[in-house]
Amino acid sequence: MAATLRPPKQVLLLHALRSLVYHWVGGSGSTCCLCPLGAKRYLLTDSIVKLKEFQRKKVAVACNLPGTKETYLRNLEEKLTQNKLILKEELRTLLHLCTSRDDVELAKHVIYRYHAENRNITLGEYKFGPLFVRLCYELDLEDSAVELIKDQHLQGFFSDSTSFNILMDMLFIKGKYRSALEVLIQMKNQDLKFNKDTYVLAFAICYKLNSPESFQICTTLREEALIKGEILPRRASCFAVALALNQNQVAKAISIFSQIMNPESIICTNLNIMIHIQSNMLKTLIDILKDATEGNLSRFVKRHVFSEEVLVKVREKVKDVPALLAEFDELNKKLHRSGQVTAYTLDALLCHTPSDRQSYTVLLNKRTVSRRTFQPLSQSLWAE
């Protein structure tokens, strides 16, 4: 949808986004009351970033290059000087040869030339955006990626959500939350479709900024997604709940939490405790902990695990009620004895990226029978 056809709510959202970025007071780090350690972790799995795959291709390109890297770069510099046409394969090879900041500077000049020559050719065209962002990811040159992705002269070069997601993840790792928000603004301005990873990143960035403005942005993005009928990932909703709690919007936190499907994760367990703490539902809070310690469950049955940090907050909340305090102390001992307490903070749990599930799928789908002999694959290999 063109920018002129945006509904008023979306225009207000973009205005709020810009206002938060350009009128923010203070540092870019987290002021989250739930995360004193301010853990900086990545949010995307390697199946999305594909850094290892990119690095393997770099090695292959370097090995198969006719001549030397220096000669190849020099020839490209001459083509730029002589205003000669830059070919797609030349740019792709260049991006796989870059190993330094100087190499990336040359790549940026080649990208500008290539895009100027090919801006009107988009159908079925190779997408260089993710390739360049992965290169910046590898070399820790996030500023170069931000510079190009925001440049209006390169409008259309970064036409995919993957480029924006990887860059936001890179900025999140570095704690550059305001810059990450600028990238989110750019993505919104280009009307690129948000996927599940985008929502996780967007809500995580808002959570880290932890301000009334970022809470409003998170709320609006969430409402827009629900209006479109999109199902938000549980991780995204957890960030939204945590942000609402940090902003003391307990009713909103309860509302969001109630819509999470299958709230059985360790994060949801601890967010539920935080909701009860801030809602002053102390008796129910103790009952939840009691339920977690009772029952002769098999060691194969998943038990609820609580953050030590969250349990400290529970004790602080019930310390003025002697009966509840005594009951909590007993439950706390039981939880520790049964291994149901983790040293990870709630922030660390929120920002932890689960392992790739794709690799397990590949293993499950791995062929075990020969198509030729119909024997088990290991035996057929010996026979062949």
Curated annotation (Swiss-Prot):
Major subcellular site: mitochondrion
Entry annotated with the keyword Mitochondrion: yes
InterPro entries listed in its UniProt record: mS27/PTCD2, Pentatricopeptide_rpt, PTCD2, TPR-like_helical_dom_sf
Superkingdom per UniProt: Eukaryota
PPR repeats: 162-196
Any single Gene Ontology cellular-component annotation: mitochondrion
Similarity annotation: Belongs to the PTCD2 family.
Protein name: Pentatricopeptide repeat-containing protein 2, mitochondrial
Organism: Bos taurus (Bovine)
